[in-house]
Every structure is written in structure tokens, then in C-alpha cells.
Amino acid sequence: MPSISGSFSGKITQQFGMPMTDQPNHLLGIAEVNGTQKSSDPLWNDSRISYWGINDLLNGEGTQTGYFNNVHPDGGRDFGTFEGKVSGAGGTMTVEGTFKFTGGDGQYSGITGGGTFKTVAKSETEIEATWTGAYELAKAQAG
């Protein structure tokens, strides 16, 4: 499987939060983030990512799960799921976790693989993300 790594600056384009009353400082939230990938792998460089993360936080710490969609410059796309741990240490929200490709179309149809990621909130509406992993396209699997 080829290794990949990359980064992107993302803008939070929509977000909603719901305070829970079961215990103090419990919050469920959902956000949509959009950005442009930067990677040394030409298949991923300049692809447009959208992801939707669901946070379950208690006192600013907890979990994030969600879905991602990458639209590549060649018109194909890959998509998948992710999960991570949310930390508010030092007053900056970070999420570290894993992602998994679950499908795609175009040359990305049948993609397998995944990896790890880290996002850091730079403001209320901006994040910086880094990621690393591996993937295999179906045509490489068949060959």
C-alpha cells in the first residue's frame, strides 16, 4: 500500500451545539469543515475535503466521530469515517484519531486503507489538520 501524508487548513462552515442537562458542562455538537488538501501524493494534492464531525464533550473533553469526503482534481472522490479523542488542554481544542476509507468513485472506487490524523482549532471557525496513512486503489489490488 502506498503511504500518504498531508495537511489542510479548514473553515467551519456550519456548526450546532446542544447543551445536555444530564450533567454539568455536557455538550453534543456537530460541525461541517471544508478545506483544500496539500500532499506530496499528486492524487491527493489539491483535493477538496469536507467532513462532518460529531462531538460528545464533558468539560471540553470527549470524543469526535464523523464522515469525510474528498473530491480529487481528476473528478473522482473517496470517502470514509473517522473517530478521535477531543482534548482542551492548554485552552486549545485538539482532536487526534484514526480514519478509514469506506469507498469512492472514479479511480477511487474500491479504495482501502486509512491512517491517523490530528486537528488543532486555530479560532472559532478555523482548524489546521495533519494526517498520515496508506491506501490501495482497487486497480492495484486486482493487478
Name each model-derived stretch.
Residues 1-143:
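Beta-strand-enriched cores of mature, soluble protein domains
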